[in-house]
Amino acid sequence: MFTIEQIKDILVEAKKLGTVDSISMEGVEPFLFYPIMVRAVEEAVKLGFRVEVLSNCYWASCPEDAKVWLLPMAENVELSLSSDFYHGESWQIEEVGNAVKAAKELNMKVEILAIKYPKAKAPCPSDIEGAKVGLYDLMYKGRAASKLAEEADKKSWREFTECSCEELVHPERVHVGPLGYVHVCQGISIGNAWQKPFSKIISEYDPYENPILEPLVRGGPVALVEKFSLPHDEFYADACHLCYAARCLLRKRCPDVLGPDVMYGEFE
């Protein structure tokens, strides 16, 4: 997990760039590290950042308790809450409803994120307790590639000639993990913020100098497969699925770019 000093370092470095206006705390579950998360919010707000927190709401056992969890950051945080069949047994998870009720009472901005689920018998609701629900496609990378892709509808691998999920030439966001890796897409590292200042990593970013990003920018996952003459299946669920499968085969050849291990399902 991050230390407070590491978080402060990233925030200060991000401020130096002059192009970053918002910080999102997500991945795993931020509320599992509650005191660190609250402090991180405070530090981000001091520097003038807009702050978003993404959560599955395991902590919202009832609206009253949810208010206690949210109160220390109610004035400074926008909430994005996950509610779908990948996080519960229905589109509308009880704990998410509790969190929305609490957030509304505290005048917090809140939205719901839901991922399409092909086996759902009922349509996804347009709102939960008055909070708008955004419905998004599942991206088949990471665990989704290994656990869910087998049952997905598939297309020819040759159709995936661009990366539609991330802007790789002029990124509008990056992901920073507790090991310091800076990713333009989860699992594709452009540097390590514990080894090189974050602001320098971003200011010196050039996808055409990166062995993995160069083909992805030029022709998507298809170009990545062709550049390295990788073995492949004929059909994949989406571009992320093909890209992830290709990157798994390239990890030993590009260890500085394709890491850390946890991004590829490897745990010590």
Where are these regions (language model features)?
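Flexible mid-to-C-terminal extensions adjoining Fe-S/redox cofactors in radical SAM and related proteins
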Residues: 193-268
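Short Fe-S-cluster ligation motifs
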Residues: 10-28, 264-268
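Acidic (Asp/Glu)-rich catalytic clusters
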Residues: 12-18, 41-46, 67-76, 98-105
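Aromatic/hydrophobic pocket-lining residues that form the small-molecule binding cavity
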Residues: 7, 37, 96
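Short, acidic/polar
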Residues: 3-11, 62-70
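Core AdoMet radical
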Residues: 1-2, 19-33, 47-62, 73-95, ...
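Radical SAM enzyme [4Fe-4S]-AdoMet core and its adjacent flexible, acidic
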Residues: 71-208
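Metal-dependent catalytic neighborhoods of phosphoester/phosphodiester hydrolases
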Residues: 34-37, 64-66
